[in-house]
């Protein structure tokens, strides 16, 4: 099952990261503005948020097996749509379709991991997160290489349908051997929407992932603009996601206590160093800034999921909180690339964007101090 989880995780980001290295060509071919081009990343991320908010309904009405299978099919179809000549409506439709598939899977998987790997939740959550980040790195690194070996540059984006199909068959075979899905499990109902902590977690998760979403949308374009090649710029994004994968594996493994604040603070400091490097010394040590920023972003992602799961020992309740956190968070994160595009149009460069995210990280450090685990059991409002 772990191998299948990794295969599925590898398909969660290439639809987003494969676009970045080709964004200048896509803009030129389709006539998109910076703000519209940003929607290629923003739209699927916002869609992830909407589907995460619907996670509770999906959990009750659609079997785990079918929801993941349908989602992988949607990701494959979304990638295949990019086989055609790039037009704004077509590209945005493919982003929306893929975002639906990604959103459903991300709403389902945390509670699946907590239920099936209860004694190893931090390690498996780290592995799942590392697979997400690793898939993003593959999308950024392999796409420019495929362009060099393809007669039609834009059709290389459609190749990312293949791993989704492989994961679909692997999941369908493996899930047939598993016991009945958890959507039939009953627990004490809890209204997470009415708790201030749930909203705090949502904003926290959103601001962290907003930095990631802006980087995968604009980091290659930023370096192309200041003189780097498309191949080199895509490689920097791949190195950032390699750092993310390392952070996603290492930091949850270091989380031996329920208090996640020290590790979260470390992850945020690394992000701040990376964004400051992009602002002041972008061409001097680009590999270092990309790796350090990725390490912080990758470590923060699974730690946020663990932080939410820590709030209840019941997988269904914890899963409901994670779904709400991801829902609000991904909607916020999805606005970040669009806002970055607006800042780019206003200022003429990307420095305002990196400065904005650096300020967000400082705010996140202050919020982190509030996550004392001793208060977790007191934070819920039960339904009558």
From Swiss-Prot:
Domain of life: Bacteria
Compartment annotation: Cell inner membrane
Gene Ontology molecular function, alphabetical: transmembrane transporter activity
The keyword Secreted is annotated on this UniProt entry: no
Keywords associated with the record: Cell inner membrane, Cell membrane, Membrane, Transmembrane, Transmembrane helix, Transport
Pfam families in alphabetical order: MFS_1
GO biological process, one term: cyanate catabolic process
Topology relative to the membrane: Multi-pass membrane protein
GO cellular component, one term: plasma membrane
Transmembrane parts of this sequence: 3-23, 34-54, 68-88, 89-109, 122-142, 153-173, 204-224, 235-255, 263-283, 287-307, 322-342, 354-374
NCBIfam families: CynX, PRK09705.1
Annotated family: Belongs to the major facilitator superfamily. Cyanate porter (TC 2.A.1.17) family.
Function: This protein is part of an active transport system that transports exogenous cyanate into E.coli cells.
Protein name: Cyanate transport protein CynX
Natural source organism: Escherichia coli (strain K12)
Lineage summary: Bacteria, Pseudomonadati, Pseudomonadota, Gammaproteobacteria, Enterobacterales
């Amino acid at each position: 099952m772990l191998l299948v989880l990794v295969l599925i995780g590898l398909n969660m980001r290439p639809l987003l990261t494969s676009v970045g290295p080709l964004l200048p060509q896509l803009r030129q071919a389709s006539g998109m503005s910076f703000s519209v081009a940003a929607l290629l990343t923003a739209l699927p991320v916002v869609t992830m948020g909407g589907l995460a908010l619907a996670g509770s309904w999906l959990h009750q009405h659609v079997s785990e097996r079918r929801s993941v299978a349908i989602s992988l099919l949607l990701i494959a179809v979304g990638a295949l749509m990019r086989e055609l000549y790039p037009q704004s409506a077509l590209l945005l439709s493919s982003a929306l379709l893929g975002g639906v598939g990604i959103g459903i899977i991300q709403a389902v998987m945390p509670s699946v991991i907590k239920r099936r790997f209860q004694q190893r939740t931090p390690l498996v959550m780290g592995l799942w997160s590392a697979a997400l980040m690793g898939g993003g790195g593959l999308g950024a690194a392999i796409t420019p290489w495929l362009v060099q070996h393809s007669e039609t540059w834009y059709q290389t984006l459609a190749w990312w349908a293949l791993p989704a199909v492989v994961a679909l068959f692997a999941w369908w075979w493996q899930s047939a051997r598993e016991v009945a899905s958890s959507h039939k499990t009953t627990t004490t109902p809890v209204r997470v929407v009415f708790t201030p902590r749930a909203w705090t977690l949502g904003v926290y998760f959103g601001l962290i992932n907003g930095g990631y979403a802006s980087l995968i949308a604009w980091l290659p374009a930023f370096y192309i603009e200041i003189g780097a090649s498309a191949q080199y710029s895509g490689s920097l994004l791949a190195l950032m996601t390699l750092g993310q994968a390392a952070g996603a594996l290492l930091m949850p493994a270091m989380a031996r206590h329920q208090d996640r604040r020290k590790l979260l603070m470390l992850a945020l400091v690394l992000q701040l160093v990376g964004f400051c490097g992009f602002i002041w010394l972008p061409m001097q040590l680009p590999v270092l800034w990309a790796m350090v920023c990725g390490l912080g972003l990758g470590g923060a992602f699974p730690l946020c999921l663990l932080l939410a799961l820590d709030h209840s020992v019941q997988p269904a309740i914890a899963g409901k909180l994670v779904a709400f956190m991801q829902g609000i968070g991904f909607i916020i994160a999805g606005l970040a690339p669009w806002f970055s595009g607006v800042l780019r149009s206003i200022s003429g460069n990307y420095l305002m964007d990196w400065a904005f995210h650096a300020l967000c990280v400082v705010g996140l450090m202050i919020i982190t101090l509030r996550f004392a685990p001793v208060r977790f059991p007191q934070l819920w409002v039960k339904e009558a």
